[in-house]
Structure formats: structure tokens, C-alpha cells
Regions:
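Soluble, non-transmembrane alpha-helical interaction regions
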Residues: 74-75, 93-95, 112-124
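Amphipathic alpha-helical segments that form the core helices of the histone-fold
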Residues: 100-114
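Acidic, proline/glycine-rich low-complexity IDRs
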Residues: 115-180
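N-terminal accessory interaction module
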Residues: 1-62, 152-173
């Protein structure tokens, strides 16, 4: 079986998110964190977590990327149990049985993302459309036979149907100088 773990290729997650997940934590999508939030009003690091974060189950921190890894039945059971504990302690689940059922669904969804080779990286892009959260996932495959451990060492990206957010740094710099 395969599950997803957080991966940190550089230090950017520590700047992008209020709390960055630790590398190699078991992860889930984390969209449930925003169920009661007014996502249209999120700003800054909270908005970044909503738009592009996977939730590290142990730290409840966020990771831009997750890696598909091999897992055992015991790993999966421990992940479900830890997420259930976190749902009770931090997200208002009424009891461990209810939390376990919700955790099972979250882990099953994470598992459904793993229909790619081991070591494939996955990124998420979340939006809020027509009153619902929408998630789109992109996969990054390593070049050649090397494992993906360095930033920018990827060749193939799947799931590029969504338009990318673009920032024109040159125009921003010119506008800043003109306005100064």
C-alpha cells in the first residue's frame, strides 16, 4: 500500500505557512481544517495553507508537497488513530469513535492520491467556488532514475489544466520605484 508523507525540498514552507509540517510526517489533504472558515476572507499564511497546503498529521503543520511512499497496514492504522486523536483534541470531534470514522475517510482519500509510482511528488491547489472547496492535484515525477530530493529537479508535471498564478516581478519593481 502507499500513503503520502510531507517532504521539504527547501526552507520555503517555513516562510509560507504559519506552522510548517516537519519532513516525513504522514499527511492528509487537510481541506477539513477550513470547513468552518470564511475562506474568501483568509489572508497571508492562512490563505497559503488553504490554497496549497497538505496537513502533516503529527504537527498539524502544512507542506507544499507530499511524496508517495510505501506503507504498511500498521502505518495506516497508526495514521488513522493519530488523526482521530488530533480531531478530538483540536477540531471539536465529539468522541474518538466519530473522529476515527472521519480520520478513516481522510486517510482513504489520501490513499486514493497514490495511484502513481513511489517517490512521485504531489502538489494541491484549492479554490472556493460556488460555495464549495475544490481541490486539484498535480504530480511531479523525478527525472531519470534519481529520487526527487532536490528542488527544481523535475521534468514532467501532470494536472496543468488549471491556470497558474503569475506574478510579474519586473512590473512590481518598476511600479514600486515609480511610486517611491
Amino acid at each position: 500500500m502507499k500513503l503520502i508523507r510531507t517532504i521539504r525540498l527547501d526552507a520555503s514552507d517555513t516562510f509560507v505557512f504559519a506552522r510548517a509540517a516537519e519532513p516525513t510526517e504522514w499527511a492528509v489533504s487537510g481541506a477539513f481544517v477550513f470547513w468552518n472558515a470564511d475562506v474568501e476572507k483568509l489572508e497571508g499564511k492562512a490563505r497559503s495553507a488553504f490554497r496549497s497546503g497538505f496537513l502533516g498529521v503529527e504537527s498539524l503543520g502544512w507542506s507544499t508537497l507530499v511524496q508517495i511512499v510505501e506503507a504498511t497496514d500498521a502505518d495506516r492504522a497508526a495514521l488513522v488513530e493519530r488523526l482521530a486523536q488530533q480531531l478530538v483534541a483540536h477540531f471539536g470531534a465529539p468522541d474518538i469513535a466519530s473522529a476515527r470514522a472521519a480520520a478513516e475517510e481522510e486517510v482513504a482519500f489520501a490513499e486514493s492520491l497514490c495511484n502513481h509510482p513511489t517517490d512521485t511528488l504531489i502538489a494541491v491547489h484549492r479554490t472556493f467556488e460556488d460555495g464549495a472547496v475544490r481541490e486539484a492535484f498535480r504530480t511531479l515525477h523525478p527525472r531519470g532514475d534519481r529520487k526527487p530530493m532536490r528542488a527544481f529537479s523535475f521534468l514532467e508535471v501532470e494536472g496543468e489544466e488549471e491556470p497558474a498564478d503569475e506574478v510579474n516581478l519586473v512590473a512590481l519593481a518598476k511600479n514600486k520605484r515609480a511610486g517611491s
